[in-house]
Amino acid sequence: MSDEQQFSLFDASSEPAASPKSAKKTAKSVEPIAVEFERSQIPVTAKMPIPPGTYSDMNDMSAHCGECHRCELGSTRTNAVVSRGNPNADILIIVEGPGENEDLQGKPFVGKSGQLLDKILESVKLTEDDIFVCNIVKCRPPGNRKPSKDEMEACRPYLMEQIRLVNPKIIILTGASSIDGLFQEKSLGITKIRGQWRDWNGIACMPIFHPSYLLRNQSRDQGSQKWLTWQDIQEVRRMFDELKAAEAL
């Protein structure tokens, strides 16, 4: 089966509807940064914390990520992979470690898995304006292996700042590493927890299969991984509409 046929499972019945531009949202308020905090040391050592409110926007944070050596991945990367999408989006998607294409281009999910993710979102008429994509770690693990616990912990403060700045209504977690990294726990495995809403600091989180896993599992039959993902993304759309309607009241 060709990649195009794989993607076609999630083809929308019509062209995706353009969503209105999101109104500028305000990042969550934070306490003042402690006097002893040294911002210049953030990219140098994981021992230096990144207090909430350190960065004013994504560009500010990206500059630090580009020179970061908080873990050993900083010495093997080509580019730090920080984000893509609308920084004021209502849906934040956390993916696993960057792959080769992402490392070369400096953007998350630009390979075949990213193309499939875009198709999945388009199938329920979610547009680029509705989403913001980031990685659980910002640098590619050698050989595309899963990021280690220490690597995720070193990079976690960047992720926390991204969540604060975007202030999403929904978080989609693709794959087990994304879940483990956000919740700081060893999950039961994506097959057991996908499709079930979880709460993280008041934000609704939906675990789904990683698109690369879907590309390796071709069946579209009822109960297959692709079929289950279709159920999950429809549930995300339902929750998205429900939260938007409540906001409009």
Placement of each model-derived feature along the sequence:
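A polyanion-binding, active-site-adjacent surface
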Residues: S2-L249
